[in-house]
Amino acid sequence: MYKRQVDEFEKAIAQSQIIMFPGGFSAGDEPDGSAKFFATAFRNAKMKEAVEKLLNERDGLALGICNGFQALIKLGLVPYGEIRQQDAQSPTLTYNTINRHISKMVYTKVVSNKSPWLAQAKLGQTYCNPASHGEGRFVAPKEWLDKLFENGQVATQYVD
């Protein structure tokens, strides 16, 4: 990234309380889509420092929708809480088990409300939500899954 753009982003993050990574078929919705771009851009030392200050020193929030959630995972912000490289054991999003894109209404159940985003949600409450993705399957080793549930980092689960 150009120095001026990095400086502008750094300044904007320093003045923010929330950083939001959007989705919406950006980057042609290629595998990992815009998540690859976000992961590359935000690994810049200045950008990384700005995000980590936002989250750790100013109690800021991060949100990722669709490809934006992939970006949070690729950056390491989920589940590590810091920008870092992934390794073979890192959680990831991958292709749906049916090997094609889905677009339908799904039911999810709140299993943790520790996040400020869900502070008012009732545990066990079920919601009907639109879902549209080709890479919506979260994969992690069992020990990671157990840890994520134990820490309350899994907010919702699909239900029938």
What label would you give each PLM region?
Residues 4-15, 48-55, 84-160:
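Amide-donor transfer/coupling interface in amidating biosynthetic enzymes
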Residues 22-24, 65-68, 75, 111-113, ...:
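Fold-independent oxyanion-binding glycine-rich loops
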Residues 3-63, 69-82, 87:
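Flexible gly/pro-rich beta->alpha loop and the following alpha-helix that scaffold active-site loops
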